[in-house]
Amino acid sequence: MQYIMLPYYMNQIRTYLLIIILSGLSLSSFSQSAAETAAYQKTVQQRAVKIVGKLGITDSAAAIRVRDIIAVHYSELNTIYTKRDSGKLSPANADSAVSRLHRPFLAKLAADLNADQIVQVKDGLTYGVLPITYTAYQDMLPQLSTEQKNQILIWLTEAREQAMDAESSEKKHGWFKKYKGRINNYLSAAGIDMKKEGEAWQERIRARAKK
């Protein structure tokens, strides 16, 4: 009987070993995923703290709330993009999900921030590209009319609204690049030689640096 039952026990042992091995792999993967999640949460928390630090919030409780709103927004966007990249969410559904986050995020910020501070948050999420670019256009083209300046600002503002929810620095800058192309076409159509003006602007910048 002992010899007859031996193969059975051997099979059971193999099964248990297989379970242990697979469990070990699963736990390892889980630990790695948990570590990556913790690292990401720390990163977005630091980003949020940096943005909030420039808002001039005097109420510490409000500052913490705003910090958490920004950090959670980063995390929610990351979850959507991760699901899209893993095939669990179609690109179209991912875009819709991202769009649905936008207004509620701004509404949450409005509970503790004024309009100017919300603009600062938007600039913080997009590396300050809007004010930098708008200033650059005015410096390069001092002859711009009020109407042209307003149109440039409108398009850069649209770019920022899109860029603030983008998944990476590259994608954020990509939105501004797209709208800058639109702006340059608009100015070229108005008779401005953008290549010539750009070269002249660079010369002025170099001349300033020498002073």
Regions found by a protein language model. Give the residues of each.
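Charge-rich (acidic/polar
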Residues: 32-211
